[in-house]
Amino acid sequence: MYNFDGKIKNCIRSAGPLGNIKDQPIESILVENNLSRQQQIVEQQPVATCHTCYDLERGKRGFDHISDRVFYIRELKSIPVDTYQVGNFDLRTVDVRWTNLCNFACVYCGPEFSSKWSDELKIRHQTPTEQQTTDFKNYIYDHAGQLRHVYLAGGEPLLMKENLTLLEKLNPNVNIRINTNLSKVDTRVFEAVCKFPNVHWTVSVETLAEEFEYIRHGGSWLDFLDNLAIIKQLGHKISFNMLHFLLNYNSVFDCVDFLKAQGFHNNSFVIGALLTPEYLNIRHLPKNVLNSVKNKLQDRINHKPGYLLEDSYRNMLHYIDTPFEKNISLSIDKLTELDQRRGIDSRNIFKNFYKDIDHGQTI
């Protein structure tokens, strides 16, 4: 995985980078810096930076659960075994975030993954030199024809011109997974993606209507619905990537029900707890409110929806029960600060949230 600041990681979930192209060429990072992790994997030892996936897999059997590690095991199962020898490297999958270009500033995002956030906070990033970036691009483009899987994310990948060049160089039978806010379908990148048969759209959404437009700042709910209808006609696979946190503790369920009513299967939903920023963590909610959420989750689990949806519910329930030091006052202060900067009043949008907070603090 490559981020526009130059960091190279095994994948987006990895807890630490392998290196940075500002310091050494990509070829050196992928071979020399990766030897110890390759050795651990070959010897079937747990890799310290992979704990996020191990935690999700703990106590579960089979492959019907959410884990990037399991996803790539399935996705690259046809790769020759000798590829996985220590010291050997053969690029077969990429996750390249060329820039942080994005037209949204989602409340839980930040400058690293959104140029709109960078502009709002007036942050300038230290990025690789033009030559370092060119060398990296050439490495990816030169190996594009042998890739089996390509993950396009961002930022907003449908806005990145580099993705157009990459798509033009890919094998037509490659598997493409694209994580998008689905705000723009009138781009050349979108047109190029539509030409591929094996596309998996991972659409970011976790609530409805005016809550959607607050959380996904810069977005339009009606545009989202129109664009969802467009990709639904393509015959591609569609999943929904959802985060569960302070503001959508109840409305995430309404979002799931709404999308299911549009005909989407229970295996289309990947829901996880928001980890950062911490002030939006769902566990800040008063105990009585969390108990209500837990009851709702347990009720939905009891109906045995199966597939990734049930696994999501179980993960959400487990996360709520993990120890946490509450500070709802800080959460409110941060939301007030955000509202003032953006000229919005969250109290007019999340009325039940503020009502539950006020009630929870008095009992």
What kind of feature is each model-predicted range?
Residues I29, Y139, H143, A192, ...:
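Residues that form generic nucleotide/phosphate-binding pockets
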Residues L91-L101, E112-Q132, G145-M160, N171-D186, ...:
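Core AdoMet radical
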Residues R177, P197-T202, L222-T362:
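Conserved C-terminal portion of the radical SAM core fold
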